Amino acid sequence: MDNTLLWNRYQSHLFHDPESGLMLDISRMNFADGFLASMESATQKAFAEMGELEGGAIANPDEGRMVGHYWLRSPDLSPTDEIAAEIGETVQRIREFAAAVHGGSIAAPDGRPFRKLLVVGIGGSALGPQFVADALGDVDNPLTPHFFDNTDPDGMDRVLAQIGPDLAGTLTVVISKSGGTKETRNGMLEAEIAYRRAGLHFPRYAVAVTGEGSELDRTATSAGWLARFPMWDWVGGRTSVTSAVGLLPAALQGLDIAGMLEGARLCDQLTRRPDTARNPAALLALMWHHATGGKGARDMVVLPYKDRLLLFSRYLQQLIMESIGKELDREGNVVCQGISVYGNKGSTDQHAYVQQLREGVNNFFVTFIEVLRDRRGASLPVEPGVTSGDYLSGFLQGTRTALGEKGRESLTITIPEVSPRTVGMLIALFERAVGLYASLVNINAYHQPGVEAGKKAAGTVLAHQADIIAHLRGTGSSLTADEIAAALGRPDAAETVFRTLLHAAANPDHGIRMEPAESLTASRFSVRD
């Protein structure tokens, strides 16, 4: 297609909202002229289902709960006055608590002000807050955020080393809806131990974001933590960033949560439009459907040309893949849906995998994210009449053109700047697109049975570990994995036995010794003297 035809197609398919500055260009997606019209009936059905969801319908039937993350920025849309009041009260409490921390009326027991923030959470309880913190944070924020987002001991040690002697001025926020998530519990216990070793009383530094009556809620109440903020059962982890999960860490960091909520609210209004051509979330969902055949046939590569948006692809990985990656449709048919999401940032990726995107296997479509404003001030030229930001823009346009020359599809989202308002817009845009796409392909976007299966399997492994080590201690012998598995009456579990003991022997915690054999799997294990 020549440049004139491309320009005409660009003009025909460019979404632009003057109030927000949001733009969406779908012209480089190679859909046929009649595609949008052919999908209109399904799109209108998706709009209707979204309206029912926002009205309080049970959108997650296997869990019997509503899905109400849209109410978080428009409480007046909540199905009950009680929910609306709880949302408003929580946001106000967050503002007041953050102001008290910044003003010093809530401080460490010795009176020193809190200057660092440790957020303990995993999945949606970390990815959203991390994205917001990195996108909007500056060196002069009143609190500097750090994260325990895994149950990796070395990872937590590194974070504690970064905090260093400032632990006495560090406020810890533990985020878990149920309070039973093991990774978060482990992070909380590791943090508590670190405070204790420093001679500090952990409850006077701790805040909980959790469900009412949860295990974490009971712990925080009985121990006298500084504060507790709610997580409601109608907010899923991956869509919780505009709840206390994301707002409390952001407010403590000193970010403009009102601006973020306003941006999300504005985008929600845009994406409620029943006119498909004027609804950017619907256009996104339809482009996903076109690119993947509605069956996950292609991957989504997310390329934000802005360092502040580096973590957006990680955030979208969970939002999209955990929502859309489902074995069954809503009627119970096996469909194995999903869209794989990965990405880093431009123009870094010019020197990484863009080579394959242009010339390798064509199994993807690209989502470019463009930010018009380069920096807060003026830029000095790096060449006559050219700035570093001009180069960044040029690389985005050049990559888009180079991919198009090879028939590689892309769409481009443009925002005027990175700000609390535009970050809220991006979050809301993709939340809505995920929900609409799920309707188009007839799946439940709001549960995650595969995640639960993985948790149960991990629990089984840890239960076996206790039996394995107890058996070794009881026999006092040097045994192979096969011998231990047979003795436990589980000969088919020899691989689990071997891998469990391989890990145990590499660490001093369980007192296990390994005697390597020529064939590694024939190695013998025993208890250290």
Swiss-Prot record:
Subcellular locations according to the entry: Cytoplasm
Cross-referenced CDD domains: SIS_PGI_1, SIS_PGI_2
GO molecular function: carbohydrate derivative binding; glucose-6-phosphate isomerase activity; monosaccharide binding
Xref: InterPro entries: G6P_Isomerase, Phosphoglucose_isomerase_CS, SIS_dom_sf, SIS_PGI_1, SIS_PGI_2
Main localisation: cytoplasm
A Pfam short name: PGI
GO biological process: gluconeogenesis; glucose 6-phosphate metabolic process; glycolytic process
Signal peptide location: none
The organism's place on the tree of life at top rank: Bacteria
Family to which the UniProt record says this protein belongs: Belongs to the GPI family.
PANTHER family in UniProt: GLUCOSE-6-PHOSPHATE ISOMERASE
Function of the molecule: Catalyzes the reversible isomerization of glucose-6-phosphate to fructose-6-phosphate.
Record protein name field: Glucose-6-phosphate isomerase
Gene for this chain: pgi
